[in-house]
Amino acid sequence: MPPVSDTPDTDPRVDLEIRDKPVPRGSGRSVLPGFGLSLGYTIFYLGLIVLIPLSAAFLKTFGMTWAEFTAAVFSERVLAAYRVSFGASLVAAALNATFGLLLAWVLVRYPFPGRRVVDALVDLPFALPTAVAGIALTALYAKNGWIGSWLEPLWVKTIGALPGLSWLGAKIAYDRPGVVLALTFIGLPFVVRTLQPVLEELEPELEEASATLGASRWQTITRVLLPELAPALLTGFALSFARALGEYGSVVFISGNMPNRTEIVPLLIITKLEQYDYRGATALAVVMLVGSFAVLLGINLLQKWSRRHHRI
């Protein structure tokens, strides 16, 4: 009879290597138990809160004829409201992406007195009711306001006098610049809070290594920093745009609500509801939903391409 060995049949090192191997995606193995229950609850919650209300909006429009639908969503007044809503939202999101990046950079990289106060002020648009924000902005930027009393004449002589920017208007409050101002105010935190964690993980040694290799500041920004920040910057841009597109409370006070000039689509939807035109309001809501989803989908695809291109 052969002697019984005290050593195990398998090498412990081989067993450890097997345990340490990552589980490939789609293998059916889950680290946490209850995946089926969690997935079912997620689908139920998403359907109850998001899909069912949106489906109801689409079903409401199915009761309209094509002539009624086109008359409701393609009138001259509605098309002007589309241009104001989408145009002002894109401009506000672009401004937030630019200045939000600078603000996040300063808050992360430069210690200065009062930095915590400034960091807390970034979240103020989250906590402040939008109606209060609209009233405050109107009081500040109106013709007789603290800021508007000296800024509006300067605006008329500079920006308002340029031929290519005459569509903005010759004043701030009660015109299109006021709409952009309100949307910029409520969307800034989305960009700053999205970029801050990425900037905190970005090591300053990358900039030092770039400078050591002879790169200029502009080359360091465009070839080192921006590729790292691009996905987060696009995410912040998309969130800011989506938030601005559905904004109502702050814009209604500072825009003046002039049809074909400063009227936004959410205000037009409220107007139709007050007139008991539920089908017309639902049709506008569906167009806004499809349009905003298409823009956000394009931004997400661009963000995905940016991440893949950066990895390559």
State each model region's role.
Residues 1-42, 298-312:
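Transmembrane alpha-helical segments of polytopic membrane transport and secretion proteins
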Residues 210:
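The alpha-helix within a helix-turn-helix
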Residues 218-222:
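A mid-sequence, solvent-exposed acidic-amphipathic segment
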Residues 202-206:
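Short glycine/proline-centered loop/turn elements that form peptide/ligand docking sites
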Residues 213-214, 227:
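Glycine/proline-centered hinge or cleavage motifs at structural transition points of membrane proteins
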Residues 31-65, 72-200, 224-249, 253, ...:
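Membrane-water interface segments at the C-terminal ends of transmembrane alpha-helices
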Residues 250-276:
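Glycine-rich helix-loop "coupling/hinge" segments at transmembrane-helix boundaries
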